[in-house]
Amino acid sequence: MVKKDKKETNLVRSVNKNIRSSTRKLNPILKGIVGKKVDLAIRDLDFSNKRICKDIKKTLSSAIANAENNFQYDIDNLVVKEAFCGKQVIMKRFRARAKGRAAEIMKPYSNVTIVLSEQMKQKEKEHGTKG
Protein backbone atom coordinates (compact mmCIF):
# COMPACT_ATOMS: atom_id res chain seq x y z
CA MET A 1 0.00 0.00 0.00
CA VAL A 2 1.42 3.36 -1.01
CA LYS A 3 0.07 6.60 0.33
CA LYS A 4 1.27 10.08 -0.27
CA ASP A 5 0.53 12.26 2.73
CA LYS A 6 -1.56 15.33 2.00
CA LYS A 7 0.23 17.64 4.42
CA GLU A 8 3.75 17.16 3.14
CA THR A 9 4.26 16.41 -0.50
CA ASN A 10 7.53 14.51 -0.19
CA LEU A 11 6.53 11.55 2.01
CA VAL A 12 6.27 7.94 0.88
CA ARG A 13 4.75 5.21 3.04
CA SER A 14 5.03 1.44 2.89
CA VAL A 15 3.05 -0.96 5.10
CA ASN A 16 3.77 -4.64 5.70
CA LYS A 17 0.93 -6.45 7.41
CA ASN A 18 0.95 -9.78 9.24
CA ILE A 19 4.61 -10.05 10.19
CA ARG A 20 5.07 -13.07 12.44
CA SER A 21 6.69 -11.33 15.40
CA SER A 22 5.65 -9.35 18.45
CA THR A 23 5.78 -5.57 18.64
CA ARG A 24 8.11 -5.89 21.61
CA LYS A 25 10.78 -7.44 19.36
CA LEU A 26 10.16 -5.07 16.43
CA ASN A 27 10.27 -1.73 18.27
CA PRO A 28 14.01 -1.58 19.15
CA ILE A 29 14.98 -2.35 15.55
CA LEU A 30 12.59 0.24 14.11
CA LYS A 31 13.76 2.91 16.57
CA GLY A 32 17.31 2.24 15.42
CA ILE A 33 16.68 3.17 11.78
CA VAL A 34 14.58 6.32 12.29
CA GLY A 35 16.38 9.47 11.16
CA LYS A 36 19.01 7.62 9.14
CA LYS A 37 19.62 7.79 5.43
CA VAL A 38 18.15 4.86 3.55
CA ASP A 39 21.46 3.24 2.60
CA LEU A 40 22.68 3.36 6.21
CA ALA A 41 19.40 1.86 7.44
CA ILE A 42 19.70 -1.04 4.97
CA ARG A 43 23.30 -1.60 6.03
CA ASP A 44 22.29 -1.71 9.71
CA LEU A 45 19.53 -4.21 8.94
CA ASP A 46 21.94 -6.37 6.91
CA PHE A 47 24.43 -6.68 9.75
CA SER A 48 21.91 -7.20 12.52
CA ASN A 49 21.61 -10.76 13.78
CA LYS A 50 17.87 -10.56 14.48
CA ARG A 51 15.58 -12.81 12.43
CA ILE A 52 12.94 -10.14 11.91
CA CYS A 53 15.36 -7.72 10.18
CA LYS A 54 14.77 -9.58 6.92
CA ASP A 55 11.08 -8.57 6.89
CA ILE A 56 11.84 -4.99 7.92
CA LYS A 57 14.44 -4.72 5.15
CA LYS A 58 11.86 -6.00 2.67
CA THR A 59 9.41 -3.27 3.75
CA LEU A 60 12.11 -0.60 3.56
CA SER A 61 13.13 -1.76 0.07
CA SER A 62 9.49 -1.59 -1.00
CA ALA A 63 9.24 2.00 0.25
CA ILE A 64 12.43 2.91 -1.63
CA ALA A 65 11.08 1.33 -4.84
CA ASN A 66 7.79 3.22 -4.42
CA ALA A 67 9.64 6.50 -3.97
CA GLU A 68 11.83 5.90 -6.98
CA ASN A 69 9.27 4.51 -9.44
CA ASN A 70 6.00 6.20 -8.44
CA PHE A 71 7.22 9.61 -7.28
CA GLN A 72 10.60 9.93 -9.07
CA TYR A 73 12.52 10.78 -5.89
CA ASP A 74 16.30 10.55 -5.76
CA ILE A 75 17.40 7.60 -3.60
CA ASP A 76 20.42 9.48 -2.26
CA ASN A 77 18.17 12.09 -0.61
CA LEU A 78 15.77 9.67 1.09
CA VAL A 79 15.66 9.53 4.90
CA VAL A 80 13.60 7.28 7.19
CA LYS A 81 11.25 9.78 8.80
CA GLU A 82 9.04 7.35 10.75
CA ALA A 83 9.10 3.63 11.45
CA PHE A 84 6.55 2.09 13.77
CA CYS A 85 4.66 -1.13 14.36
CA GLY A 86 1.23 -2.11 15.59
CA LYS A 87 -0.44 -5.21 16.94
CA GLN A 88 -2.37 -7.59 14.73
CA VAL A 89 -4.06 -10.84 15.68
CA ILE A 90 -2.63 -13.25 18.22
CA MET A 91 -2.96 -16.84 17.08
CA LYS A 92 -3.49 -19.12 20.06
CA ARG A 93 -2.34 -22.72 20.19
CA PHE A 94 -2.27 -25.28 23.00
CA ARG A 95 0.41 -27.76 24.02
CA ALA A 96 -0.47 -30.88 25.97
CA ARG A 97 1.04 -30.99 29.45
CA ALA A 98 1.11 -33.50 32.27
CA LYS A 99 -2.01 -34.75 34.06
CA GLY A 100 -4.41 -33.72 31.31
CA ARG A 101 -3.56 -30.04 31.42
CA ALA A 102 -2.78 -27.71 28.53
CA ALA A 103 -0.39 -24.79 28.17
CA GLU A 104 -1.32 -21.87 25.94
CA ILE A 105 1.07 -20.84 23.16
CA MET A 106 0.66 -17.27 21.89
CA LYS A 107 1.78 -16.54 18.32
CA PRO A 108 1.59 -12.76 17.84
CA TYR A 109 1.46 -10.95 14.51
CA SER A 110 2.35 -7.31 13.84
CA ASN A 111 2.30 -4.76 11.07
CA VAL A 112 5.17 -2.43 10.18
CA THR A 113 4.84 1.03 8.66
CA ILE A 114 7.86 2.88 7.26
CA VAL A 115 7.60 6.50 6.11
CA LEU A 116 10.37 7.95 3.95
CA SER A 117 10.98 11.62 3.34
CA GLU A 118 13.04 13.33 0.70
CA GLN A 119 15.59 15.58 2.32
CA MET A 120 16.96 18.25 0.06
CA LYS A 121 20.59 19.19 0.42
CA GLN A 122 21.04 22.57 2.05
CA LYS A 123 23.33 25.08 0.46
CA GLU A 124 26.58 25.46 2.31
CA LYS A 125 27.37 28.93 3.51
CA GLU A 126 30.33 30.60 1.93
CA HIS A 127 32.82 31.59 4.56
CA GLY A 128 33.48 35.29 4.44
CA THR A 129 35.82 37.38 6.47
CA LYS A 130 33.26 38.01 9.21
CA GLY A 131 31.29 34.99 9.11
State the predicted function of each range.
Residues 2-85, 111-119, 123-131:
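Ribosome large-subunit tunnel/peptidyl-transferase-proximal elements
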Residues 16, 101-103:
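Short beta-strand/turn micro-motifs at beta-sheet edges
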Residues 65, 99-101:
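Short beta-turn/strand-loop junction motif enriched in small, turn-promoting residues
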Residues 72-74, 95-97, 104-109:
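A generic structural micro-feature
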Residues 85-97:
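A short, conserved strand-capping beta-turn/loop at the end of a beta strand
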